[in-house]
Amino acid sequence: LIDHDPQGSSAQWLDARTKNLPSIYSVAAYRKDDNHTTRSFQLMVPIDTTHIIIDTPAGVSGNVLSDHLRHCDLILMPVVPSVIDIRAATGFIKDVLLSPGFRIKPKPIAVIANRVKRNTLGYNKLEAFLNSLNIPFITTIRDTQQYVRAAEFGMGIFDFTQPNEKDREEWQPLINW
C-alpha cells in the first residue's frame, strides 16, 4: 500500500492493524526521506509483492498525476454522493483522460459510489452522474458502521470473522472487475 496522501490515512489504518491479520507492506510516500536515499529506494516494495494499491490525494493533477498513471495497471475512483465530489470527479476524469501518462498507455478506469445512503437525493444525483459517464460504474458501497469499526482496527470488510453478507455482496463486482 503506497500512500501518497499527506493526510496519511492509509498509513494510520495500517498502524491500527493487529499482527493476527494478514500483513500488508506500507510505503509512506508522502514523507520525503532525509537520510540520503533515492526516491526509488524509498518507494521500493518487497520482491514477492503481487498487488500494489496507490492511494493519492484528491485533486492530484499535472506531472504528478501523469507519473502515477505510468505506474499503475488500473484506475479506481471512489465518489461520494455530494455535488462537490461530483464536480471534483468530473475534473479528475478529464485530467486523467488528457494526461500524457494515460494517453501514451491507456489503463482501465472505473468508478464506485462510496459511503452511500440509498434513497436520498444525493445518491440519486450521484447515480445519474456515474451512469452518464462512458466509464464503468462498478458498484455502490453503503455508508455503514461496519466500515467505521474496520477503520478503527485496521481491518477490511473481509477480515471480520463474521462479515456482513450485504457488505461482501457489494464488494463482489469490484473483485470481479
Label the predicted regions.
Residues L1, I54, M77, V111-A113:
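Structural beta-sheet core signal
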Residues L1-G62, A151-E152:
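P-loop/Walker-type NTP enzyme "switch/lid" segment
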Residues P6-G8, V83-I84, V116-N119, Q146:
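Conserved nucleotide-binding/hydrolysis micro-motifs of P-loop NTPases
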Residues I47-D48, N63-V83:
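Inter-motif core of Ras-like GTPase G domains
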Residues R87-K107, N114:
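Conserved C-terminal guanine-recognition region of P-loop GTPase G domains, centered on the G4
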Residues K117-R118, E127-F158:
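Beta-strand-loop-alpha "switch" segments that mediate conformational coupling across diverse proteins
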Residues A151-W171:
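C-terminal boundary of histidine-terminating zinc-finger modules
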